């Protein structure tokens, strides 16, 4: 599509075709990370057969593996495997999901990091210079799909924040990255062997860009459009050597139209939105396509709204309290949602 835009004389707002191809191939992204000296989980260099995946699993001495689609994303085409007997089914399902969702069947394998936190670095480049706009914590997930995102991470040490940010910048510089991009990492600060590793890069604007906007005061969509129009970072008043500081904390809560079965499996919720009243006020932002009378389609993403709260306080618990109040003010009827799940998450003492 990007090449077709160029051939038609149109400017695609986003990375160029080469960067989309590179980061759309997770195995190629691993190769880039290796070239830049960025830590990786032990894994295959490219697509593997089931027999090769089984041999890799056996070599991990019980650590388990992640089976991932080379062209996957959004939590699809991924399976964690802890028992050898489960590997054939996981492999087959990843291949099937990858074929259906992305048109690519290849899968690769990595050692499983059991106690990982998910940290991502927001990058902006103009083709010559690149800079970091801070990190986001996306550890609260269900079946590898994000539910709650936070900026900046309240759990990351300054040492690891610096190391991970520099790794993301090194990879972006190596390819002369242009546009917005997100470099994603797994972190286990308790590990002496691999406290953090690169997992993938997403060459696009992320759903959770909102929390970065709230703590930096930057409009990421506007910046992406400006870079696509040929503007440099310096012409936009941005200095890669002096990235914008974060103020306080922001939390994004994904309100989905879904039901949660007894088996823990989420399924799309259907019906007509009879009531759709979401909170407003200082420190509360809502991005949504929902409205009373709407009938969300069960055939696409179940996301109804992004509820984003922010606090300028340096104490994360203050933002967490605002999140609890905002969720309590939501009134949605007619379609089942995950509001109760989100309320349960932010009410746990571990969340503060």
What is each stretch, according to the model?
Residues 1-24, 39-45:
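A short, GP-enriched loop/loop-strand-helix hinge that lies immediately N-terminal to
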Residues 52-53, 86:
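Short acidic active-site motifs
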Residues 45-52, 114-116:
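Short acidic loop-to-helix transition motifs that present clustered carboxylates
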Residues 28-46, 154-156:
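Conserved thiamine diphosphate
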């Amino acid at each position: 599509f990007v090449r077709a835009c160029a051939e038609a004389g149109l400017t695609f707002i986003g990375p160029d075709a080469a960067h989309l191809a590179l980061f759309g191939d997770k195995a190629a992204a691993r190769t880039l990370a290796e070239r830049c000296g960025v830590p990786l989980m032990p894994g295959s260099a490219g697509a593997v057969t089931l027999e090769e995946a089984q041999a890799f699993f056996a070599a991990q001495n019980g650590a388990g593996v992640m089976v991932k689609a080379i062209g996957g994303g959004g939590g699809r085409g991924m399976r964690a495997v802890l028992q050898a007997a489960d590997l054939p089914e996981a492999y087959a399902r990843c291949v099937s999901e990858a074929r259906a969702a992305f048109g690519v069947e290849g899968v690769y394998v990595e050692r499983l990091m059991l106690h990982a936190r998910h940290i991502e670095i927001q990058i902006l480049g103009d083709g010559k210079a690149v800079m970091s706009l801070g990190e986001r914590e996306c550890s609260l997930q269900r079946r590898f799909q994000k539910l709650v995102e936070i900026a900046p991470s309240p759990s990351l040490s300054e040492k690891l924040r610096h190391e991970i940010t520099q790794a993301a910048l090194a990879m972006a510089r190596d390819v002369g990255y242009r546009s917005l991009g997100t470099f994603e990492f797994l972190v286990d600060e308790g590990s002496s062997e691999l406290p953090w590793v690169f997992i993938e890069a997403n060459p696009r604007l992320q759903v959770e860009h909102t929390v970065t906007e709230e703590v930096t005061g930057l409009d990421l969509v506007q910046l992406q459009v400006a870079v696509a129009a040929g503007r440099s970072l310096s012409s936009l008043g941005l200095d890669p050597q002096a990235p914008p500081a974060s103020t306080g904390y922001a939390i994004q809560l994904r309100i989905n139209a879904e039901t949660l079965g007894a088996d823990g499996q989420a399924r799309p919720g259907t019906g007509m939105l009879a009531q759709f009243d979401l909170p407003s006020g200082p420190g509360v932002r809502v991005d949504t396509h929902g409205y009373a009378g709407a009938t969300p389609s069960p055939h696409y993403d179940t996301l109804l709204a992004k509820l984003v709260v922010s606090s300028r306080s340096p104490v994360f618990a203050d933002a967490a309290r605002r999140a609890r109040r905002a969720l309590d003010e939501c009134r949605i009827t007619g379609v089942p949602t995950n509001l109760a799940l989100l309320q349960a998450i932010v009410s746990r003492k571990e969340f503060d």
